Structure formats: structure tokens, C-alpha cells
């Protein structure tokens, strides 16, 4: 993510300030803001009232949400505008009416303010202290809003979103493979505790929506992003340390190359004995190769092919990084609790989204797609167990793998892929061939679980072939390889 500052004035400088009587800004703000804020010009829709400052703020916020989010220019503009509105409200108030005047700022104001502050942390990831201050300030803002609007669903979702993002940017980012639970607790980095707390906040938003029968918030990709962020976090945990290990391997390879170069530079001329030995070895090797040539050519070719296949398999199967039990992420990685939480609440999200008559078709497809993919992923283990026990001679006589018999593995895998197909079909986009191919690939996976040349298998293959042919024609041959593999 971009770290360069394209904001107003000088580089963003985190500065946490204590709010007193709703009048003092708590947000870390860029310096030189007053003179440069006016330089930010955003074209707002004609429907936005030029005299409605909150409407203008919402327009500015929407501009950022709809952008590539690769610059903090608009974010700084939003924060400065929020600061100004807050100061202006307090300045125009007096005496006991102060709280009433401050309350005129709607819940949306606190949401926008908090999100802008948390998003700004993305542009300062090289300074963990600044990241911490941005998240602290954003949480203070959303909590201020919740004090005034405790039943506002958007604010509760906003808090959950900030907490999840904070876990990744502020806490997980500081962990190493050698990090320990004890060290994490000292630094107030109880990742599991913070994740549990964030998920409880999300659940409270769900509960409020159900109690009030207000499901409008679920029609926003902003809040769907929360579940995606949870999924991404779990993916980070599953693959934690891989990048660190790859970097170490690259460094070792570079060091070896340097050592070889140094050795070559330091090496002197060969002695007569060295030369004689080398010539004798070369002659013997040539004689052996001449005698064996032809008689072993086919055998060698087969061995080479087998070695190449094994190398390809090794490349495809990345070795899993094992975390020690003392690692802060170990307890999250080794339980299925959070994957199940994601699945359950994604299903709830889809159910709530369907309550709306004007639910976003794009969002419906995306949620269905993610659910379909999650069921396919879950089906990988039982599918592999079935294939291994059924067709791999090396496992002949073995009745169970991963706690599953051949029949159980087949049944479980079939059920999961059938479920996946249900969601993938609901995610189909008539204008997007890739969504068709997702369905075809799931059909092929399901077909492979039936008896060879059975009626069920042949029907699934035929259906998949039709879909792949259609997708291939629509994309000028993009899926020809997939089609050839099926027909071959």
C-alpha cells in the first residue's frame, strides 16, 4: 500500500489531543492544514446541498470510498473538515446548551471522522507509534458517537471494522516467527483477546439490526468489508512467516553466490596432479556413457520425466510454516473456531441482505461467491482422502486417512461441493465468464467423486463442457486449456 503523503501541506504528523467539552480535536492531523485545506477541490453531485455542510462531508467521504484509496489527500481533507465542524459547533454554543449543540452533529459525522482517521494509518505503516495514535483517535471518535447514538447500527459496525483493521496493522504487523505469547502480553498484544472483542462488537451490530428489523446497513460494501477483513486476517495467520522465510532463503542464496565468487577469485592455478585426475575422470566418464548410450535412453527419459513431475508437485505444494505453541497466533491458527465464525456470520449477512427489496445484485453475487469458495475449500481434504484411498496403490489396504474412510470422505466431499455449487450458481454473472467457469470447475470436482463413467459423472462432465465452451467462445480462447484438460 502507498506510503507517500499527498495530503494537504506538509507530511502528516500524528498528534493526539484531549477532547474538552467537545471542542478540542483528538485527531492526529497534518501540519499546515488551515492554509492548504482550501486547495482540496472535489466535484460533488448536484443533489448535494451546497449549504449543507454534513451533506458535503458525506460527498467528500463517498469520493474517497469510491476512489482507488492510494492517496491520503482526500482523507486529510475529511479530517480537517471534521475538525472545523466540531470547533464551529462548540464556538457557537454557550452555557448549558453546549451538549445540545454538539449533539446536532449526526451519527454519520462520527462514523466518517473515525473511518478517515483509521484509514490514514495505512499511509504510515512504517511508524508504529503513528499507526497506534491514528487508531486510538479513531476509536475515541466512534465511541463519542456511540455515547450519543448507542443504538446506531452504522456506528457499531464502524467500531468493529476499525478494531479488525487495528489488529492487522498495529499488532500482527509487529510479530515475528520467534515472537512469544509472553512478549505479546507485555506489549498489550493479546491478538486472540482483541479478535474476540472485535467479533463481539460485530455480533452486537447484527443483534441490533435483528431487534430493530433494520437491515439497510447490510446493503453497504463498507460493512461487507468487515467479514472480508476477518477472512483476510485468518489467511494472514494461516500463512504467517512464509514471507519471512522466503526472504531468509533469498538472503542465504545471495550469501552462497557471494562465497562462490570469492572462492573463484581466490582460487589459484590447478596443479599437474589435479589436471591428470580431471582428465582421467573425464575419459572414464565418457567411456561409461558411450557403453550405456542407447540401451538406457528410454529408462533415463522415464526417470527424468518422473523427477520433473515430482519437482512440479513439490513446487505446487508449499510447505506449511509451523508456529510454535508459544506463538501469539498459534491458538488462532490451530482452531477452526474462527473459520466457522466467518462462515456462520457470512450466512447471516446473506440472509439479512435478502431481507431488502433493493439489495445490491453485485453484493449478493460477491457474498454468494465467497460462500461457494469456502465450501470448495473445505471439500479439498475429504476429496483428497477419497482420491488417495481409491486410486493410489501406495495406500492399498489403508482404511482411513485424516479420520475418514473412503466412503465417508466421498460422502462429505460430495455434500460440500453440492453446497458450493448452490452458492456459485447464485453468484453467476451473465456478463462475467469467470463466474461461469467457477461453476464448471466445481462440477468437474464433483464428477471426480463419482464412479468412473457412471451416469452422474458423465452428466456433470457434459454440463461442465457446455459451460467451458461457452466461456471459451466469449473470451476468444481464454479457457481452451481447461477445456482441453476436460476433453483429454
UniProtKB/Swiss-Prot annotation:
Q: Where in the cell is it found?
A: Nucleus
Q: What is this protein called?
A: Enhancer of translation termination 1
Return the Polar residues bias intervals: 26-38
Any one GO biological process:
regulation of translation
InterPro entries assigned to the protein according to its UniProt record, in alphabetical order: Nro1/ETT1
User: Hey, what's the signal peptide range on this chain?
Assistant: none
Region Disordered: what ranges?
1-38, 242-272, 287-328
